[in-house]
Amino acid sequence: MINFRLYDKQLDMDLDDWSTKEYSKYYDDVHKYALFNESISQVYQSYIDSPDLMDSISDKVIVVENGKLKIAIIIINYYESEKDNKKVLGINPILINPKYINKGYGKQIIQYLIDCKGRIFDMNPDRLYAGIDVDNLRCKHLFESVGFKLVGKTDDNEFLYYELEL
């Protein structure tokens, strides 16, 4: 059974290992698609230092566990859409523990968010959203496989936008 909890800088310092070359063969993908040459604690600190950076109702760094195993980190941006005033839970990014990529955890996590209609912590969204690097075929396949629809892309064609109405 998976469990979602807020990132705790003291408790979760070991997650910084996920961003090292020694940890797994997915080092390049981890940095290209999720961490952008930072550690997880640095990403977390950037949200602490700039709480209004994303113009969100709230932003959360979430640890996903399966029992005692830390299987993923998700950055959640919860905001109100400017186009229709609906509440949106943005998943940006989801980082599966690199030792467990391609083991089905990503799909299990996203399906859980769909099944609970994104109602985690204090959020009650109308839709789920994900911004995905155009080259991240693994992530595009994951979101498409659970029903997300492509709704747009950046002007430079580097990122695709996917949504799922709840």
Feature annotation, model-predicted:
Residues 119-132:
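Conserved GNAT acetyl-CoA-binding A-motif
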Residues 85, 136, 156-160:
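Short acidic/glycine-enriched loop/turn segments that link adjacent beta-strands
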Residues 5-99, 116:
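Acetyl-CoA-dependent GNAT
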Residues 151-166:
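C-terminal "cap" of GNAT-fold acetyltransferases
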Residues 97-99, 103, 134-135:
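Active-site acidic-Proline motif in GNAT/NAT acetyltransferases
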Residues 107, 133-152:
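Conserved active-site alpha-helix within GNAT-family acetyltransferase domains
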Residues 100, 104-112:
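Conserved acetyl-CoA pyrophosphate-binding loop and the N-cap/start of the following alpha-helix
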